[in-house]
Swiss-Prot record:
The chain crosses the membrane at residues 26-46, 55-75, 100-120, 140-160, 198-218, 239-259, 273-293. The gene is OR10H2. InterPro entries: GPCR_Rhodpsn, GPCR_Rhodpsn_7TM, Olfact_rcpt. SUPFAM superfamilies: Family A G protein-coupled receptor-like (SSF81321). It comes from Homo sapiens. It is found in: Cell membrane. It is a multi-pass membrane protein. This is Olfactory receptor 10H2. PANTHER family: OLFACTORY RECEPTOR (PTHR26453). Glycans are attached at N5. GO terms for biological process: detection of chemical stimulus involved in sensory perception of smell. One of its GO terms (molecular function) is G protein-coupled receptor activity. Residues 1-25, 76-99, 161-197, 260-272 are extracellular.
Amino acid sequence: MLGLNHTSMSEFILVGFSAFPHLQLMLFLLFLLMYLFTLLGNLLIMATVWSERSLHTPMYLFLCVLSVSEILYTVAIIPRMLADLLSTQRSIAFLACASQMFFSFSFGFTHSFLLTVMGYDRYVAICHPLRYNVLMSPRGCACLVGCSWAGGSVMGMVVTSAIFQLTFCGSHEIQHFLCHVPPLLKLACGNNVPAVALGVGLVCIMALLGCFLLILLSYAFIVADILKIPSAEGRNKAFSTCASHLIVVIVHYGFASVIYLKPKGPHSQEGDTLMATTYAVLTPFLSPIIFSLRNKELKVAMKRTFLSTLYSSGT
């Protein structure tokens, strides 16, 4: 898959949370509970959309696919992090490190692309309702979903290939809980490291900023159309279909901007690790909560699905 350059070292050591030895057991239990809740919440959303025929619409199809991407993203990161919290042996093979970076970036960017697609879906539903069935046909939805996954895979491949073509020398300790770009760049040596760092940074920022601007543009048109609705009840009903998606977008990009766009200055590695953990663990944890609480139709359907599952298991 990659022309990996590992002439200087064959494995890395994930330092992770070694600076917090007294907190590792507590962090393990906390992250394990959040991880299990993330999996169960997203699986419940998927089961509900699958079982309720009234939810077989593009909006809930995209939500279901978003849940898949969140499950895969957390699976790519959190199990390894949990294992390291209980272990003193935190080495990770070169190929395993590259694989973790590829999958985490692929599913992370797929998540961003799907949020953009969901924004477009809401724009079409509110601003062009008469053309909705044409623009959001099954074939069109499949194309949007396929492009999101393909785009995420391409981004993961581009970033991983660029980083692991570098030569790594000196220390093999990654000052992070996963194989991430900034700490790996600190271990790389060679004249091309600054160019690779700049290129990878620009590609990631342009992709994420492009998604964010498209979402903003969609909501600019949505708000403009909602304000034209004469009744307050109509405006509230129209906006309620967008509220959960908008909150998830704010949480997703809010945490990402705090972590990746914070000004460079004197700050501890421990602080960076905790902030990155917030993004990797807390964001997927909050997403199913927001969608299930803010979407009345989904909330009612989830209760019905959950109760029917309990009843069938009880009998």
